Amino acid sequence: KINIHFKKKNYFKVIKKSETLLKNNSNQHIIYNYIGLSYVELNNLDSARKIFLKAIENDNLHASIFCNLGIVHKNLFLFSEAEKNFKKALELNRNHIQSLINLGHLKSSLNHTKEAEIFYQRAYLINKSEEILTYVILNHFANSKFSAAKKIIEEFKYKFPNNTKVDHFFSRVHNYKNDNGHLNEMLEKTNNKNLSPEDNSNLYFAIAKAYSDQNQIKESAEFIIKANETKFQTFEKYDFLNEENQFKQMKEYFKNFNFNKSYQSDNEDKLIFVVGLPRSGTTLLHQIIGAHSNVFAADESVILEGVFNTKFKNTTAIKQFFNLEPIDSKIKSDLYNLIKQNYKMHHPNKIVLDKMPFNFKWIGFIKIFFPNAKIIHCNRNVQDTALSIYKNLFEGPTMAWTNSPYYLTKYIHLYQDLMNFWKNKLG
């Protein structure tokens, strides 16, 4: 019954019934998992963490418990603890596939892609599922192992011919200038009436790229438009007002903020942030600066945005942060230490280079916590940037604005306005 409630997303019922069962017998790791995962689904990570820790205290030393605790710690941006949990799970069961995958994810998020490859490959040898093949391919991309990626892609295409994500993967590493084979396969797939909008959008982006390689501009443009229109259909609940509110609130919070009273770090801010719009040249600059022997190129680190979004889940939390004058030093030091500790997991000694473009939204916080960090703003011709964004596939509901010319234009205006605000505020 608990399993049925969980599948139906009746998470409060799962918690209530499971807690009753635990009163009779506390040595049931499956029950702890149901409770903890229900709290995760309810976005109550602190309660989930307490449940998994309680399970361990009651000698439920099972790989799944440590794995799920690791997932919670990762979502709380306690990366060091998460790594310990995943490794403990693998000590208990070296073939625990979810621990292998999640340890791979953790290493990948730190841009330790060679280490990530080890764990993804171990998972791949156990289960060559669509999910795991996808992770292996993406990690090969990150390591610039395009030949190896192509080999896995061919295996993927053979095993799962109806999966169109692999067609898009293939288009990223293939030049169609003198090759119509795969292009014809994709055009044939578009006749399949059973494909979802998500499936079709993958195909359309890949076909547009193929036509672009062949310099068939008209055909490429037609499929770019179809790809974006179809992709945008998949975001039924998208509300651009959320974007507008975030930009507006950021300006409101910092409008009268006195940076001279901000928390002073230990003057060891070995951080460089490259910010701007996607497709604005951040990758090229990342490669140039990252080539220096004293710099660790962290790629697009999730740390800054992740920590702030986790700690400031709602407007009440962020208002409390700014309403204290001066801001409580313990709150600042705790946040500072959490962010700094995670950046040091990229590399403990080198200067960490973070090219997450959207960190432009957090420049005010960067100046509070890391006043000595370097911030480099990439500012490419806005029309070229907009076209490049529109031509490329971005995943996730927060990127829905990239699939609509109207919202894309509005987002760029919001970005320009916020960057002007930071420039006037910080000089």
Describe the role of every protein-language-model region.
Residues 28, 62, 96, 129-130, ...:
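Residue-level recognition of tetratricopeptide repeat
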Residues 3, 33-41, 64-75, 98-108, ...:
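Conserved alpha-helical positions within TPR/SEL1-like repeat arrays
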Residues 24, 58, 92, 125-126, ...:
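Structural marker of alpha-solenoid helical repeat scaffolds
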Residues 157, 295-298, 302-325, 346-427:
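PAPS-dependent sulfotransferase catalytic domain
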Residues 217-333:
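PAPS-dependent sulfotransferase catalytic core
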